[in-house]
From Swiss-Prot:
Highest amounts in brain, testis, lung, and spleen. Lowest amounts in liver and skeletal muscle. This is Palmitoyl-protein thioesterase 1. Palmitoylation reduces PPT1 enzymatic activity. InterPro entries: AB_hydrolase_fold, Palm_thioest. GO terms for biological process: adult locomotory behavior; associative learning; brain development; endocytosis; grooming behavior; lipid catabolic process; lysosomal lumen acidification; lysosome organization. It comes from Rattus norvegicus. One of its GO terms (cellular component) is nucleus. GO terms for molecular function: long-chain fatty acyl-CoA hydrolase activity; lysophosphatidic acid binding; palmitoyl-(protein) hydrolase activity; sulfatide binding.
Amino acid sequence: MASPGYRRLLAAALLPWCCAAWALGHLDPPSPPPLVIWHGMGDSCCNPMSMGSIKKMVEKEIPGIYVLSLEIGKNMVEDVENSFFLNVNLQVGMACQILEKDPKLQHGYNAIGFSQGGQFLRAVAQRCPTPPMMTLISVGGQHQGVFGLPRCPGESSHICDFIRKSLNAGAYSKVVQERLVQAQYWHDPIKEEVYRNCSIFLADINQERHINESYKENLMALKKFVMVKFFNDSIVDPVDSEWFGFYRSGQAKETIPLQETTLYTEDRLGLKKMDKAGKLVFLAKEGDHLQISKEWFTAHIIPFLK
């Protein structure tokens, strides 16, 4: 029969293991990855009819998730104005600072960009690897740019009228490039050399002047890059840009898919390697620009956020 001293020694030795086993059995479930959202042209971070609604939907579908909807400016009015008139490179820099300072994002986050917010968040992924972006979802983003005049009916229609006139007057002039957001991803397939030399944003993040290896490495670090294309899009021209396709160089009628572009065949951004590794996801949806139902969003987007 064991002595009292031996029993006490055995109990002392087993106690930490018992406590550890009990603790492991009562661990809280891991928190879902945080989510960062960037709105599109003429929208704001917190519009209850758009990004505010998306934020609430995600929070309902994924309990406990932290959602940050980026506000570029001091308030919603500035946020809307900046989506038209603040240099995109400055906007991306501001977004990077916001993300870097947020303690809830330091272990990584997922991101959803709506319309132009899609290519803006891709720029964040390429330029600012800290904190790390895990999955990027681009909903109607224009990753090869646009070559069509923007249409935005409603309250912003007068601004779009001004944008059309400015782009017609000279999309690649220095003053238009520096002061008009949409000019900074204007891609003229008939004037490719002018575009490459004068585009202050898109030509840079698409590696069309020179190769920045860090851009490539940072984008390839994504777990998934999801692109949503709208078949009946009346805003984005060409719509293939939403899947990284574009017009064949030298004309503006025939479009080619991503896999036939120089960007892909020369793998200037790492997209070819990502495609082969199964990291690129192409989703298609009937309907016009950003026309998304709650049911579609829940079925096709929410699974990437868990």
